[in-house]
Amino acid sequence: MQYRRILLKLSGEALAGKDGYGINAEMLERFAEEVKEARDMGAEIALVIGGGNIFRGVSDAAKNMDRVQADYMGMLATVINSIAFQDALERLGVYTRLQTAIKMEQMAEPFIRRRAIRHLEKGRVVIFGAGTGNPYFTTDTAASLRAIEIEADVIVKGTRVDGVYDSDPETNPSAEFFPKISYLDVIRKNLRVMDMTAITLCRENTLPIVVMNMNEKGNLSRLIRGEHVGSLVHA
């Protein structure tokens, strides 16, 4: 097994599917099955899910709002997605714990690092909601932070494309693909792998990032088995 402990970062838009907003039940179930398959192989899986399918603090909808208030709304959106994903996993028989950076005791545990690690060691999937609990930080940064805190072997960013390109392959068919690329090159080329705070955190803690297509069935399991999937961002 190439990676035993993984933090999977999914965008909220991924859960929306072709609808572009809200939660698509088919996409939710598909991603939950991918996570279950990886967990059943013996991997320890944690997740961070964005909230852009419901609300994004830097979106047009929030342009006249106070940024802090808008970001808190975005954090709540991530919790909605996290609860939905927890439910999807538990319907598949996967024990799942939701931990949030903001206390919501009726529906989630508070984030406690040692408890999260213990859950993972017991074979439970752990979902981290509400970002970092602080405004001005993205869920990419939250994913990097949590991955470092739980001592993950890798952070996997699930996207709609096959990995890292020099431009958007959905609009530029001749975009150059990078099977491997360094953190510094990502920063120098200003590639939209993750935001710069997240990339810098990973670089400073030598946490590798794999960017891959989560719409490709079985990709997560192939990665765990040691097959080359997507793009590797490394030192």
Curated annotation (Swiss-Prot):
Residues 17-22 are annotated as: Involved in allosteric activation by GTP. The keyword ATP-binding applies. The keyword Kinase applies. It is found in: Cytoplasm. It catalyses: UMP + ATP = UDP + ADP. Keywords: Allosteric enzyme, ATP-binding, Cytoplasm, Kinase, Nucleotide-binding, Pyrimidine biosynthesis, Transferase. One of its GO terms (molecular function) is ATP binding. UMP binds at G51, D71, T132, G133, N134, P135, Y136, F137, T138, T139. InterPro entries: AceGlu_kinase-like_sf, Asp/Glu/Uridylate_kinase, Uridylate_kinase, Uridylate_kinase_bac. Its EC number is 2.7.4.22. It comes from the Bacteria. SUPFAM superfamilies: Carbamate kinase-like (SSF53633). GO terms for cellular component: cytoplasm. Pathway: Pyrimidine metabolism; CTP biosynthesis via de novo pathway; UDP from UMP (UMPK route): step 1/1. Allosterically activated by GTP. Inhibited by UTP. One of its GO terms (biological process) is 'de novo' CTP biosynthetic process. ATP binds at K9, L10, S11, G12, G52, R56, T159, Y165, D168. Homohexamer. Catalyzes the reversible phosphorylation of UMP to UDP. Belongs to the UMP kinase family. This is Uridylate kinase. It comes from Chlorobium luteolum (strain DSM 273 / BCRC 81028 / 2530).
